[in-house]
C-alpha cells in the first residue's frame, strides 16, 4: 500500500444512491438519501426517529484545511493519513460521554465505517458556538492591540498570553452569511454578542428565545465533560467550537441537539498539560499545523490577511508541503484520538473501496 492510497482525499464521488446534489464541505461530504431509502433504513435498523425523517450519509475525508484553504504534501499526498478516522473516533467518544452524562443527543444514528456516519436531517442554528477557557490565538492578538470587549463581554486588564481566563467565555460568531440582521455585517464568521442573538433569535435559527439559554447550557456542560476527561489524560482543553441544530424526535417534538463534530483537533485547541505547567505550549490540535504554515512560508501575512485570499489560494495550490510535516500532523491526530478513546486508529489500505463495499452489502445503498 502506498501512503497516498491510504488517504481518502476525494469523498464526493462515491456511488451512493441519491436524488440530490452531493454537498461538499472542507472536510465532509453529505449524500442525502432518497425518501424510499431513508424510510427503509429507519424501518430495518430501528432508528429512533419519525418514519419520514430524511437521512444522509456523511463521509469524512483526510483533507487538511487551514486559513480557509486545502493543503497537500509531497508525493501527491492529498491529506493526512489517519486524520478522518481520528476525528470521527474522537467525536463518537465525546457524543457517547454526553449521553452518559444526560446531555443532548447528536444527529448521528449509525456508524457503518470509521469514515462514515448515518445522520438525521437537522435544522441548524446559524451560530458558531465558540467557548474559551484560555486567552490565546486571535483573542490574544486582539487583546494585545488594546481590545477589551469581545462579543459584548469586557475582559479585565493585565491578562497574559495563554493564561486561564477568570471564567468560561462564550464568543459566538455567525455561521454562513446572514442578511438583514441589524448590526451584523453580511459576511461569514462575524463575531456577535448574546444581545445580537436575543434580538434576532429567529434569524439565527432558534425556535424559541428560551433556547438561547439551553444552547449556552449545553455548550458549557459539553465543554466541562470534555475538559474533565482530557484533564485525566493530562491534556488542557483550551477552546472549542460546537454546532447545534433541531431535530424532530419519534414523538414529533422538536429538540435541540449537538451537530457536526465535537472536541476534535480540528474544532478545538488542546495543549499538553505537562508542557503547559513548564511554561511551554505543545499543541495537540490543528493549531500546530497553522503555526507550522506561518513559519514555513516567508510571508505569513498572506495566511492572515483576508484581503490577500487569491495569493493564499495560490500558495496552497502550488506548494507541496514536506512529507515529515504532514506525518507530524498525522501523529498529532492519531495520538490524541488513541489517548481519548483508548483504541488504536488503524490505517486502511483503501478506505473508499471499504466504504462502498459496506454501504452496498450491509445497507443496500449502492446499485
From Swiss-Prot:
Task: Return the Pfam families for the record.
Answer: SAICAR_synt
The record, for InterPro entries, names:
SAICAR_synt/ADE2_N (IPR028923), SAICAR_synthase_Vibrio-typ (IPR014106), SAICAR_synthetase_CS (IPR018236)
Q: Which GO terms describe its cellular component?
A: cytoplasm
* Biological process per Gene Ontology, one example term: 'de novo' IMP biosynthetic process
Xref: SUPFAM superfamilies: SAICAR synthase-like (SSF56104)
Q: What class of enzyme is it?
A: ligase
Q: Which EC number(s) does UniProt give?
A: 6.3.2.6
Q: Which pathway does this polypeptide act in?
A: Purine metabolism; IMP biosynthesis via de novo pathway; 5-amino-1-(5-phospho-D-ribosyl)imidazole-4-carboxamide from 5-amino-1-(5-phospho-D-ribosyl)imidazole-4-carboxylate: step 1/2
Keyword presence, Ligase: yes
Reaction catalysed? 5-amino-1-(5-phospho-D-ribosyl)imidazole-4-carboxylate + L-aspartate + ATP = (2S)-2-[5-amino-1-(5-phospho-beta-D-ribosyl)imidazole-4-carboxamido]succinate + ADP + phosphate + 2 H(+)
Gene3D superfamilies per the UniProt record, alphabetical = ATP-grasp fold, B domain, Phosphorylase Kinase, domain 1
Task: Name the UniProt key words of this record, in alphabetical order.
Answer: ATP-binding, Ligase, Nucleotide-binding, Purine biosynthesis
Q: Which GO terms describe its molecular function?
A: ATP binding; phosphoribosylaminoimidazolesuccinocarboxamide synthase activity
- From what superkingdom does this record's organism come? Bacteria
Give the family per the record: Belongs to the SAICAR synthetase family.
Q: What is this protein called?
A: Phosphoribosylaminoimidazole-succinocarboxamide synthase
